Amino acid sequence: MAEGIAEAVRRLLADPARAVEILGAVQNDGVLRRLEAARSLGKLVLDTQAVAHPAYPDATIRTPLIVGLTTQDRATYLNEWFGPIAFVIATESTAESLGIARDAVRGHGALTLSVYSTSDDVIARAIDVAEDAGVALSINLTGGVFVNQSAAFSD
């Protein structure tokens, strides 16, 4: 599955002119340091690449980094890795994946949780997890995500 995600990202960003408009610029050197540090945290599924913006030659633009982890890598995936960094966590089952999501939200908080599935059963179980953990759930979301939409109503 991780390789399938990586291939989809590669295809989406294959045209540099399109990629720079999708990705946007890196805002600070901390993101670049995290990208470098994250490369060695697990299996490198998709390495980050620099992309030059034709209209903004001084812009720093990077493609996403995808790192494969195991459930034993909790100290890594339960931390925030701000930037174009994604972790794919190998689990034994959907139930285990949903349990990790529930425990992460309960233990660390979250504004949103996303699930992508074609299975009505998986979606129903994800709804139960989100309700139990007290987090907003998006199902098969495409387009923009409003990460902080809940913040104004947090009380």
Question: Where do the protein language model's features map onto the residues?
Answer:
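Flexible, acidic loop-helix segments that line cofactor/substrate-binding pockets
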Residues: 3-40, 48-60, 78-80
